[in-house]
Amino acid sequence: MTVTISQVLRPRGPQIERLTENRAKVVLEPLGRGYAHTLGNALRRVLLSSIPGSAITQVEIDGVLHEYTTVEGLQEDVLEVLLNLKDVAIRIHSGDTATLSLFKQGAGVVTAADIKTDHNVEIINDGHVICHLTKDTTINMRLKVERGFGYQPAVVRRRPDDENRTIGRLILDASFSPVRRVAYVVEAARVEQRTDLDKLIIDIETNGTIDAEEALRTAADILTDQLSVFGDFTHRDRGTVKPASSGVDPVLLRPIDDLELTVRSANCLKAESIYYIGDLIQKTEVELLKTPNLGKKSLTEIKEVLGQRGLGLGVKLENWPPPGVSQYGMLG
């Protein structure tokens, strides 16, 4: 009997359940054995790395020359203010860049709602706290917003001519991705008498600049476009794909020694029970700076090395560590 491509099991349309305003669960079934892991892992990686978004990339603050400047009347240090600015969920409706401003006077909290925008820019989480003024003082900022995708550390985004850039212009690590978290699980599915089938369940959470369903559609379009280049083959060798044993990216299971950090940085991380890349990327910059003997120079090194691999800090991972992993290595 001749088997054609059209006879390969095709899933029904996805079932979408909106869990919160920015989070949704998508169920796709039935799938042939192994297809759920193949599709789930591919979609997860595209969702986290390739969905376009906007982020604040440069900041100028009156009276601030660098990120370690102390500002009188400001409760937070400048470094913490920059970290808070990175979490502002912002959307540019047209164009690739925008310049915004923030001015606040008097004691009190400064939020994203204090950023002055125009009709082309929209701030989603306007209640997000940026800093606190402790006395009757003022803070004046100029913010540059850009569109992009993925995570781009400041050390990677600086151009060679940036040494002559305006004094006081602070370049931020930019997390353009509007997708905050993606997890998938595979369950058994059944169609009539067939029980050797898969069900794919994807849990997606965004920052609100794009809804979860639209993010998934965009990821599927990207994958379709990438795979379309194979459509010109006159002969197709349909080899089998071995299903992944889990939904965890294999890169995250690699030890931090693979990052080739300096001995000092590596030892500081291991002293805090950070043994895998998956352990490391879940830490925030503030948490790492609290690590004994790990200073700003080591933090910069870690961010640069992760950035070269398309990774960043402050990532939320579901079900970590996965089964079979301990702080001493892979379990048999």
Curated annotation (Swiss-Prot):
Cystine residue pairs: none
CC annotations in GO: cytoplasm; DNA-directed RNA polymerase complex
InterPro entries, per database record: DNA-dir_RNA_pol_insert (IPR011262), DNA-dir_RNA_pol_RpoA/D/Rpb3 (IPR011263), DNA-dir_RpoA (IPR011773), RBP11-like (IPR036603), RNAP_asu_C (IPR011260), RNApol_insert_sf (IPR036643)
Enzyme Commission code(s) on record: 2.7.7.6
Keyword Chloroplast: no
Source species, domain of life: Bacteria
GO BP terms, alphabetized: DNA-templated transcription
An example molecular function term from Gene Ontology annotations: DNA binding
Region (Alpha C-terminal domain (alpha-CTD)): 248-332
Similarity comment text for this entry: Belongs to the RNA polymerase alpha chain family.
Domain characteristics, as noted in the entry: The N-terminal domain is essential for RNAP assembly and basal transcription, whereas the C-terminal domain is involved in interaction with transcriptional regulators and with upstream promoter elements.
Oligomer status and interactors: Homodimer. The RNAP catalytic core consists of 2 alpha, 1 beta, 1 beta' and 1 omega subunit. When a sigma factor is associated with the core the holoenzyme is formed, which can initiate transcription.
Name of the protein: DNA-directed RNA polymerase subunit alpha
Organism from which the protein derives: Xylella fastidiosa (strain M12)
Upper classification of the organism: Bacteria, Pseudomonadati, Pseudomonadota, Gammaproteobacteria, Lysobacterales
Name of the gene this protein is made from: rpoA
